[in-house]
C-alpha cells in the first residue's frame, strides 16, 4: 500500500458550518491522519496522510463537505511528510487553531 501526504485548501462557505469537525470525523472513519484548520481568509486548510485510496476519498468527500457547507473550489498538492509534525501528540488527526 502506497502512502501519500496531500495539502488541501477548501474555499466557499466552509467556516461556521461544522466543516472542521466533519473533516476530522471523516478522516478518522477512513483511517486518514493529518490535521484541519480555519484560515483567516475564510478558507479551510487540511493535511491528509494515508493510503492513496483513502486520501483520494477524503479529497472527494471534501468537494461536498457537511450538510450546510458550499464548496466553491478545492486545491490539493503533495507535501513532505514533515508537515505532519503539527499533529498533537497521541492523536492521528488534529483540529488546529486558526491561522
From Swiss-Prot:
Q: Which InterPro entries match?
A: Acylphosphatase (IPR020456), Acylphosphatase-like_dom (IPR001792), Acylphosphatase-like_dom_sf (IPR036046), Acylphosphatase_CS (IPR017968)
Q: Under the GO molecular function aspect, what terms does this record hold?
A: acylphosphatase activity
Please list the residue ranges annotated as the Acylphosphatase-like domain. 5-97
Family annotation (PROSITE patterns): ACYLPHOSPHATASE_1, ACYLPHOSPHATASE_2, ACYLPHOSPHATASE_3
- The kind of enzyme this is, by top-level EC class, is hydrolase
Which residues act catalytically here? 20, 38
Reaction(s) this enzyme catalyzes, per UniProt: an acyl phosphate + H2O = a carboxylate + phosphate + H(+)
Annotated membrane-spanning segments are none
Pfam families to which the protein is assigned, alphabetical: Acylphosphatase
Which key words tag this protein in UniProt? Hydrolase
Q: What is its EC number?
A: 3.6.1.7
Q: Does the keyword Hydrolase apply?
A: yes
Q: Which domain of life is it from?
A: Bacteria
In which family does this protein belong, per the annotation? Belongs to the acylphosphatase family.
Name recorded for this polypeptide: Acylphosphatase
